[in-house]
């Protein structure tokens, strides 16, 4: 179909909504807790109390972060917290988001090892998504993260028992395997029964989460998409072979999360409504590139006398 001189074509390209970092995970890294390359885990958040890192977290949408409820044992006042996103190191960066609201599943921080150790953090304003800041996908409530499944845990916590992370304070990653419920229950057996509850998931390395990793994500790749299986919750020691790390099982809380965040990214199409949208607008002499409605670049096309310009 021919176009008149004042007509144009508008093309839309939907960008995958969650779980697809622009820097791929090579799968060849040494197991056990090593520095993560920039952009590999773009949903990783640092939760800070009075500018001091206290917990990890994961970005679910431009306005919401998932973390652990016990992270707020120091304060339940949202104005005391800041959230850093898109950063590889824990530094005193001036770029952070303030917190508008904290929603804990149990209504208040519980003691270590308690059930319901999950919380949502609403940011004061949505963050801009980029190659360094992307949301992770939520699994379906029926998803099965089976025993032996290979997953990754990330954070800025201790690198061993009594060993704080050393400069340059780079984000650490460790490959872990999901542990079956029976084995984990036996590992944490007590006179009153097992400490492992139905809303908990266990995984072990030799890599493991440790102090200050709480609230961070345990993610597993399913059909090429990274889904969050767990939230770092508790454990006995760090990296002990007979004591798996214990996580809040995300599948147990997916419906609760979607109740508060309808736009949170699922493993399928439900992640797309808030995803970045590319729009290419063509006129006979002008090309405009928009991302989420923001003009990123404009190019004059037809006349060689027009120099290409970028905003």
From Swiss-Prot:
Top-level taxon in the UniProt lineage: Eukaryota
One annotated GO molecular function: serine-type endopeptidase activity
Residues annotated as the enzyme's active site: 70 (charge relay system), 117 (charge relay system), 214 (charge relay system)
Membrane topology: Single-pass membrane protein
UniProt KW keywords: Disulfide bond, Glycoprotein, Hydrolase, Membrane, Protease, Serine protease, Signal, Transmembrane, Transmembrane helix, Zymogen
Protein location: Membrane
Disulfide feature: 18-137, 55-71, 151-220, 184-202, 210-238
Positions bearing carbohydrate: 77, 192
PROSITE patterns to which the protein is assigned, alphabetical: TRYPSIN_DOM (PS50240), TRYPSIN_HIS (PS00134)
Domain Peptidase S1 residue range list: 30-262
One Pfam family of this chain: Trypsin
Keyword Membrane recorded: yes
Signal peptide region: 1-16
Segments passing through the bilayer: 277-297
Gene that encodes it: Tpsg1
Any GO CC annotation of this UniProt entry: membrane
Major enzyme class: hydrolase
Tissues showing expression: Expressed in many tissues.
EC number(s) from the headed UniProt entry: 3.4.21.-
Chief location: membrane
Protein source organism: Mus musculus (Mouse)
Protein name: Tryptase gamma
Entry's family note: Belongs to the peptidase S1 family. Tryptase subfamily.
């Amino acid at each position: 179909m021919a176009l008149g001189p004042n007509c144009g074509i508008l093309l839309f390209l939907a960008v995958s909504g969650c779980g697809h970092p622009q820097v791929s995970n090579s799968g060849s890294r040494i197991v056990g807790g090593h520095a993560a390359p920039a952009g590999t885990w773009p949903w990783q958040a640092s939760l800070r109390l009075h500018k001091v890192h206290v917990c990890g977290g994961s970005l679910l949408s431009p306005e919401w972060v998932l973390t652990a409820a016990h992270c707020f044992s120091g304060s339940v006042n949202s104005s005391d917290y800041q959230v850093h996103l898109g950063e590889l190191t824990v530094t005193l960066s001036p770029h952070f988001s303030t917190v508008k609201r904290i929603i804990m599943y149990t209504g208040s921080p519980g003691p270590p090892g308690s059930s319901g150790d999950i919380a949502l953090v609403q940011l004061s304003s949505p963050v801009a998504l980029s190659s360094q800041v992307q949301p992770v996908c939520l699994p379906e409530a029926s998803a099965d993260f089976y025993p032996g499944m290979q997953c990754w845990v990330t954070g800025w916590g201790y690198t061993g028992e009594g060993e704080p992370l050393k400069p340059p304070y780079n984000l650490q990653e460790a490959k872990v395997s999901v542990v079956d419920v029976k084995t984990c229950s036996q590992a944490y057996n007590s006179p009153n029964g097992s400490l492992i509850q139905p809303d908990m998931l266990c995984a072990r390395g030799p890599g493991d989460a440790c102090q200050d990793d709480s609230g961070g994500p345990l993610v597993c790749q399913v059909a090429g998409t990274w889904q969050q299986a767990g939230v770092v919750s508790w454990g006995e020691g760090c990296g002990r072979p007979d004591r798996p790390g214990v996580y809040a099982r995300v599948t147990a809380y997916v419906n609760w999360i979607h109740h508060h965040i309808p736009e949170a990214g699922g493993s399928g199409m439900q992640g797309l409504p808030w995803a970045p949208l590319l729009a290419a607008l063509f006129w006979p002499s002008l090309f405009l590139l928009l991302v989420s409605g923001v003009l990123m670049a404009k190019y004059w096309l037809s006349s060689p006398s027009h120099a290409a310009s970028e905003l």
